[in-house]
């Protein structure tokens, strides 16, 4: 277990890289944490618990490569939303009101419906979701980008890609050994795979 002191404002890239036996991250009360950088917890495959403090206003793509099952966010944090207790949503720009980026999915999920207002599934969002069977998108999806390795090593079986998607980044479906069905909606705007 690691308890981050209240004076720490940022967790840098690779800060806990390879900490295989790390099980939980806690933050002191009155935490001043503002940013969790990309790849902060890469290789922390035993990490199961983290609670995001209220002052965090930036979580970078690919911040977490773990099997977190106990995830929470301070009710006072207005920058992120744990939607349906399954997916972490954030804002791509602090000046906008809507949560338009999907940053993380609870590793135990089997099925998820992604809200229409999400325009990017960020890198590694569904990485190691070993119970995932299907992903659906609400009607009139605004999704534009499926990020790098976003479904890497998941057990996704089927997906219908919304017509709004213009880019599927590198390794988005790498090692999806159970993937049997991929369909693109009519009038697809896809330009890059």
Walk through the language-model features, giving the residues of each.
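Consensus positions within tandem repeat domains that build extended binding/scaffold surfaces
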Residues: 12-17, 37-40, 62, 101-103, ...
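Structural signature of tandem-repeat unit edges
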Residues: 1-10, 20-35, 44-58, 66-97, ...
């Amino acid at each position: 277990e690691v308890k981050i002191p209240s004076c720490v404002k940022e967790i840098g890239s690779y800060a806990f890289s390879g900490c295989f036996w790390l099980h939980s991250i806690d933050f002191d009360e009155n935490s001043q944490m503002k940013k969790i950088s990309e790849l902060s917890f890469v290789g922390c495959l035993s990490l199961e618990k983290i609670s995001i403090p209220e002052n965090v206003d930036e979580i970078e793509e690919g911040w977490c490569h773990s099997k977190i099952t106990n995830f929470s966010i301070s009710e006072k944090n207005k920058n992120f939303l744990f939607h349906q207790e399954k997916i972490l949503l954030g804002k791509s720009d602090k000046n906008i009101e809507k949560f338009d980026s999907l940053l993380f999915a609870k590793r135990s999920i089997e099925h998820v419906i992604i809200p229409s207002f999400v325009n990017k599934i960020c890198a590694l969002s569904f990485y190691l979701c070993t119970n995932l069977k299907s992903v659906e998108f609400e009607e009139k999806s605004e999704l534009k980008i499926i990020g790098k390795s976003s479904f890497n090593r998941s057990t996704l079986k089927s997906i219908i890609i919304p017509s709004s998607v213009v880019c599927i980044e590198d390794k988005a479906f790498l090692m999806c050994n159970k993937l049997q069905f991929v369909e693109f909606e009519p009038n697809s705007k896809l330009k890059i795979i």
